[in-house]
């Protein structure tokens, strides 16, 4: 099967790049930059990409690759730091102080990499630059194929070795049309890949992989959340294992309004029997007094495991299945030691060392949009597939600070009002995710001519294609006013509503 490997040097866009390549129907995997050459070659990659990163190639102990990789006859594309690394490894000098940020005029020259952009003549356009270092002179046998005013060597190629370098990021949305064309040229034409990464193929591979891993007699326990990921996984596992799957839905007390009944009805219609366990007392007890977001996630993850472990004693199961997806792994920073931890995912960072069940994560290398596409192939109803993402820790990370029952009830009702109004205004499917956040601080208000102290609710909505980056939508004043009025009037404890206008980055989508 055709495949592209990305060696990750710590760029915040590495996984966006991987998703872009998969959209070309070619499998792409992200590996740490220091992956041994032998392991890389064992995967028989059709092409390699060196990602960007926060380092400078002239610094001591900067990340580098085994130089034998250049003799492998595998096409290589270096992006930003990756280009500078290739240039340095072939004898060129890289210097700092030549920074460019934002939209920059650039000229593309004829190259196989720019097929369809600069076939005969130079192509003038603008591209988004974000770099502090520049290649001073092209290495021997390399040609300059793009230039900007402050970066004369903005792209390079060595046709003989099929080595290419870009000083800019083709994967960022600002450069989408041009960037997509460049990536397509590299992946499809230079690497000569075939379109083998398709949802129908993925479904068959996942089912086969599940059966091989679990064997013919062992059983699997799945913790349902009611979200897209666990719902898709439930049907996938049922198709693979039949009645050897046991589904447990844990009522943590941290779920959305009416979620327990909705989940029972949805899965009953899919022919899946589920066991509902009310563990809300345990979760609130374990979270008592804990304010740190990271600690809350770990406590919630540990509590899930304890509940599942107890349930498994009566179900004769050997495996615990989780709906971990690629973005969960990414945000927990397990793909590259040059990346800093943003937040632990409860499925990833919160697992205790001693796990009495073997872990099964079939969706671990799928992005959210791929999970949704898989759900359609599996026949899940749109109401499940198109539902907004909900964090594994639930409302536990939408109550800032200590999690208390009364706080959860407040944010649960506020969230329900917000979602209801979005659906009424036909906005629910126009935003990628929306929810309410409880702020445990009181402010002064006036209700019924009396002085009143009440809590604050923050409303959060984002638009995103991959949830690695996101922007806030400009919801109308009239719409926000309706939401605010209902929340303040229908929830006595609330006296103030604010709307979050923070993009990701720098903010994350969830507040905790």
UniProtKB/Swiss-Prot annotation:
* Active site positions, chain numbering: 80, 169, 171
Q: Which reaction(s) are listed as its catalytic activity? A: XMP + L-glutamine + ATP + H2O = GMP + L-glutamate + AMP + diphosphate + 2 H(+)
UniProt EC number: 6.3.5.2
> What is a GO molecular function of this protein?
ATP binding
Q: Which Gene3D superfamilies match?
A: 3.30.300.10, 3.40.50.880, HUPs
Q: Which residues form the Glutamine amidotransferase type-1 domain?
A: 3-196
Which controlled-vocabulary keywords does the entry list? ATP-binding, Glutamine amidotransferase, GMP biosynthesis, Ligase, Nucleotide-binding, Purine biosynthesis
Please give the function described in this protein's UniProt entry.
Answer: Catalyzes the synthesis of GMP from XMP.
Query: What is the designated name of this protein?
Result: GMP synthase [glutamine-hydrolyzing]
């Amino acid at each position: 099967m055709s495949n592209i490997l990305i060696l990750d040097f710590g760029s915040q866009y590495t996984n966006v790049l991987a998703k872009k390549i998969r959209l070309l129907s070619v499998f792409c995997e992200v590996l740490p930059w220091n992956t041994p050459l032998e392991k890389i070659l064992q995967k028989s990659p059709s092409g390699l990409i060196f990602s960007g990163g926060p380092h400078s190639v002239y610094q001591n102990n900067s990340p580098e690759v085994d130089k034998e990789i250049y003799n492998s006859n595998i096409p290589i594309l270096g992006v930003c730091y990756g280009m500078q690394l290739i240039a340095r490894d072939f004898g060129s000098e890289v210097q700092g102080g030549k920074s460019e940020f934002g939209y920059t005029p650039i000229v593309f020259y004829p190259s196989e990499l720019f097929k369809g952009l600069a076939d005969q003549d130079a192509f003038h356009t603008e591209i988004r630059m974000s770099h502090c270092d520049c290649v001073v002179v092209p290495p021997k046998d390399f040609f300059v194929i793009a230039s900007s005013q402050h970066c004369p060597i903005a792209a390079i190629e060595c046709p003989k070795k099929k080595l290419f370098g870009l000083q800019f990021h083709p994967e960022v949305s600002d450069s989408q049309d041009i960037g997509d064309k460049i990536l397509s040229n590299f992946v499809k034409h230079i690497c000569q890949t075939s379109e083998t990464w398709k949802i129908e193929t993925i479904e068959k591979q996942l089912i086969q992989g599940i059966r091989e891993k679990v064997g013919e007699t062992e059983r699997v326990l799945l913790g349902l959340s009611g979200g897209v990921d666990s719902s898709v996984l439930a049907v996938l596992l049922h198709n693979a294992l039949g009645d050897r799957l046991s589904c447990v839905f844990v009522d943590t007390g941290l779920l959305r309004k009416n979620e327990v009944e909705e989940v029972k009805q949805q899965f009953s219609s899919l022919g899946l029997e589920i066991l509902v366990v009310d563990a809300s007392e345990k979760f609130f007890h374990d979270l008592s007094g804990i304010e740190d977001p990271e600690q809350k996630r770990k406590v919630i993850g540990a509590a899930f495991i304890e509940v599942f472990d107890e349930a498994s004693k009566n179900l004769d199961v050997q495996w615990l299945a989780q709906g971990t997806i690629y973005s969960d792994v990414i945000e927990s920073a397990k793909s590259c030691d040059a990346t800093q931890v943003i937040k632990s995912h409860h499925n990833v960072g919160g697992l205790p060392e001693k796990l009495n069940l073997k872990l099964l994560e079939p969706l671990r290398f799928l992005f959210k949009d791929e999970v949704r596409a898989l759900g359609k192939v599996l026949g899940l109803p749109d109401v499940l597939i198109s539902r907004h993402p909900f964090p594994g820790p639930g409302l536990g990370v939408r109550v800032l600070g200590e999690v208390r029952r009364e706080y959860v009830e407040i944010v649960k009702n506020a969230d329900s009002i917000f979602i209801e109004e979005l659906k009424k205004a036909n906005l629910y499917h126009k935003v990628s995710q929306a929810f309410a956040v409880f702020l445990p601080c009181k402010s002064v208000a006036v209700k019924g001519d009396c002085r009143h102290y009440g809590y604050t609710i923050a409303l959060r909505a984002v638009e995103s294609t991959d949830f690695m980056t996101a922007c806030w939508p400009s919801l109308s004043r009239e719409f926000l006013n309706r939401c605010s009025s209902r929340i303040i009037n229908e929830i006595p404890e609330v006296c103030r509503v604010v709307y979050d206008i923070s993009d990701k980055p720098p903010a994350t989508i969830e507040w905790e």
